[in-house]
Amino acid sequence: MNKLLTLLLAFTMTPLFAGVSGSMALTSDYFFRGASQTMGSSALQGGVDYNNGGFYAGAWGSTVDFGTDTELEYDFYTGYAVALDDLAIDVGIIQYNYDGEMDSVEEYFIVMNYAWMSFGFWFDQDNSDSDYTEIEVNLPFITFADVSFKHGEFGNDTDYQQITISKALNDNFTMGLAVVSEESVDIDLDERVAFYLSYNF
């Protein structure tokens, strides 16, 4: 956690140039595709992104807890996004890395956005069992906050649903909550809730 905190402080103390943005967040639980990455505990997260036209690249990190010696996740990604009227298409690659003895994972993805809906597909060329599909719907008729519903499926027997409600407090701070329900062939887990506060700069 000290490594991530040092990086986050470096981001906030460094003036960002055109095309570069950053974020920090504190969350009561870190969900990834329906599963907690912190065994129900809080996480400190942060990242930095560079955008130039349709090209982008970035890095993102979070504290994690799997009950092993792995305590930090750090991801790198790059891609290209193009917008055609109401349709936007994003293709890229992302690598998930971990300290300790946990192996890194590399995925290719394509995400299509149309109006208030998006559909995405992520695949690992080394492990087809972990291929992941996701559909997300933002609810434009709700005006008091940003509300979205997400359904994801991965592997052969697991899916989850997530409802996220967020509210911008000002130009930099956003607070929100996420409610997640995960299902598999053998187990239906209870709903879990995470609260978060993020800062964008």
Positions of the model-derived regions?
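Outer-membrane beta-barrel proteins
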Residues: 4-6, 15-201
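Repetitive helical segments and hydrophobic/amphipathic motifs
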Residues: 11-12
